[in-house]
Amino acid sequence: MGDSASQPNAQSLRNLLVGLSRFEQFPVAIQWARENHCVVDMFGAFAKERHLLLFQSGNESENWIDPTTNLVYKMNNLMHVGGDILKLLNRVELYNHLFPHIALRFVGFHVMSENNAYPVFTQPFVDNVRFATVEEILAYMKSRGFKPQDRDGVFSNGYYLLSDVKPKNVLASDNGLAIFVIDADVSLV
C-alpha cells in the first residue's frame, strides 16, 4: 500500500481542495470523483461485486472486509475532522508516514448527495491478532520515540501528536511481538 497522499489521484484532489471551506470542498470532491471514476457505492454494486462483508466499525467509519484480497474498506464519516476532507487527507498522509506497513490507500468517495460524500480507504487486514493491552501500546510507542501525554491514548515525539491510540485501535500478534496501530489521529505539533 502506498502513501495515499503521494498517489496521483489523492494528490490531485488535495490540490483542488486547498483554500476551500469544508462546505465548498464537497461539490469539488464529488465532481473530481465522477471525472476520475472514483465513486464508490459501499451499499450497492461496488460492494456486491467484491462480495464485501460488513466488518467491525467505529465512531468515525463503517468498515467492510474483502475476503478475496484481505483488504478492509473504511468509509470515513469525517466526524473527527469537522467535515473537512482536506484535513482528513492530510492526517492520512501523516498516519501513512508513521505506519507504512498498515497504510491507508484512498479509493474514492461514497456519494450521498450533491453536497455530501464520505471518503473511502482500504487498509490491509491483519489476521491472528487481538487488541493490544495498554502496557503493550505504551512499550511500543516508547520504542518509536513517543512519550505519553496528559490524556489517555495521546502520544507525542515533539514533532507528531497521536491521539486515540487505545486498545480498540491497536492490534497485537498473539505473542505480543508485532503491534499494528490500525487507527489513530495524527497531527503535527
Where are the model-predicted features located?
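Conserved structural core of kinase catalytic domains
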Residues: 77, 96-151
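Juxta-kinase regulatory segment immediately upstream of eukaryotic protein kinase catalytic domains
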Residues: 1-51
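Conserved hydrophobic "DFG−1" position in protein kinase catalytic cores
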Residues: 65-66, 122-125, 172
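Protein kinase-like catalytic core scaffold
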Residues: 71, 119-121, 161, 180
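Catalytic micro-motifs at enzyme active sites that drive phosphoryl/nucleotidyl and oxygen chemistry
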Residues: 50-54, 60-62, 107-112, 151-159, ...
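ATP-binding glycine-rich loop module of kinase domains
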Residues: 48-100
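Catalytic activation segment of kinase domains across protein kinase-like and atypical kinase folds
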Residues: 77-78, 154-189
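Acidic surface patches and DE-rich sequence motifs
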Residues: 58, 66-67, 112, 173-175
